[in-house]
Design a protein with these regions (language model features):
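N-terminal binding-site loop/beta-alpha segment at the start of enzyme catalytic domains
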Residues: 1-75
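N-terminal small/glycine-rich loop or linker at the start of catalytic domains
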Residues: 7-23, 78-90, 113, 118
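Acidic (Asp/Glu)-rich catalytic clusters
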Residues: 8, 64-73, 106-110, 139, ...
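Short, well-ordered coil/turn segments that N-cap beta-strands
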Residues: 11-16, 43-46, 71-75, 111-115, ...
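Conserved beta-strand positions
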Residues: 18, 49, 79, 116-119, ...
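Short, acidic/polar
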Residues: 27-39, 93-109, 157-161
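Active-site groove signature of glycoside hydrolases
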Residues: 106-124
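Beta/alpha (TIM)-barrel catalytic core signal, keyed to glycine-rich beta->alpha loops juxtaposed to Asp/Glu
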Residues: 123-310
């Protein structure tokens, strides 16, 4: 797998990342083991998780498998803090919560440091200075090597990065993790140009448009899919409108012409977008992951890229354009 810099840092990572949000829930330990084996075999290095995934079980499972595969020195472990499941306050980026959450993540992952520690979301209740101070403390302690953001808006990203860059002795933020796909290109309005200006890299989550870009929902809803589950159907149905249908149809046509799957084409398109480091592959099964990893070998012709750009155009307006 080809390598890329992890934002403005000295770390290089594979240009596809392994997501683990389903681990400990719909992905059991056997599938997770197969996924990690396939990812490592493909040359992947960046593995993304979060303290709230499966109420911490995900981090525990990842830590167990890293030990089993004896691969700690060859992988880049990224996790997140801030989110609070099943509580009235959804996000907590206070110093106390962050540092306690970090210690719990280290214990569950069974590692002595986190390579990339990401703030999962913006917390409207906590002063940004306090959040950034906690990041500095974590890095100074050796428990964290680098830090990044997730789901920050354009102005939030710019403010956080600028404050870190201007504060003597602080370590700049190096990444932002955002939803980004052919179906969701809103980040191109402010996040992408901000990332370029600030020297941060983009890690796209849900690069297959919540599964819709695989094409499996074109004609019906598979009974074993997230689209059929009462708990997750709303997550998928966001992309059930006519615009999404046109994009998926165009993607399927392009894939047929390239003798590839729609998923491979969608991932290759996103992988090559400006500022992108590595789309995060959050597969439920190893078969799904293997299909997604096939995109590493696919290079899109310019005319296919242009056609996909056109059909999925986010329609920039004032003041972006």
């Amino acid at each position: 797998m080809q390598q890329r810099p992890l934002g403005n840092s000295g770390i290089r990572v594979g240009r596809l990342a392994l997501g683990t949000m389903t681990w400990g829930r719909t992905t059991d330990e056997y599938e997770a083991r197969d996924q990690l084996a396939a990812f490592l075999d493909a040359g992947g290095t960046l593995i993304d998780t979060a303290d709230v995934y499966a109420e911490g079980v995900c981090e525990e499972l990842l830590g167990t498998l890293i030990q089993e595969f004896d691969c700690r020195d060859s992988v880049v472990v990224a996790t997140k803090a801030v989110s609070l499941p099943n509580t009235e306050r959804r996000f907590n980026a206070s110093r106390g919560h962050l540092l306690d959450a970090l210690d719990r993540s280290l214990k569950r992952l069974d590692v002595d440091h986190i390579d990339l520690w990401q703030m999962h979301a913006w917390d409207t209740y906590t002063p940004l200075e306090e959040t950034l101070s906690a990041i500095d403390s974590a890095i100074a302690s050796g428990k964290v090597r680098y830090a990044g953001m997730s789901n920050y808006s354009g102005w939030q990203s710019a403010r956080a990065c600028t404050m870190q860059q201007l504060k003597p002795g602080s370590t700049p933020l190096i990444t932002t993790q955002m939803e980004y796909s052919l179906l969701e290109r809103g980040v191109e309005r402010e996040i992408v140009p901000a990332a370029k200006s600030l020297g941060i890299g983009i890690l796209p989550w849900s690069p297959l448009g919540r599964g819709v870009l695989t094409g499996k929902y074109r004609h019906s809803i598979p009974i074993d899919s997230r689209g059929a589950s009462p708990d997750t159907s709303a997550f998928v149905n966001l992309y059930s409108d006519e615009r999404a249908k046109r994009i998926v149809d165009a993607l399927a046509t392009a894939a047929q012409g390239l003798d590839a799957s729609p998923a491979e084409v969608a991932l290759a398109w996103l992988r090559d977008r400006p500022g992108v480091i590595a789309p995060i592959l959050g597969a439920r099964t190893n078969a799904q992951l293997l299909l997604a990893l096939g995109s590493e070998e696919l290079e899109l012709p310019e005319e296919i890229t242009a056609a996909l750009n056109d059909i999925s155009d986010p329609h920039m307006g004032y003041p972006e354009s």
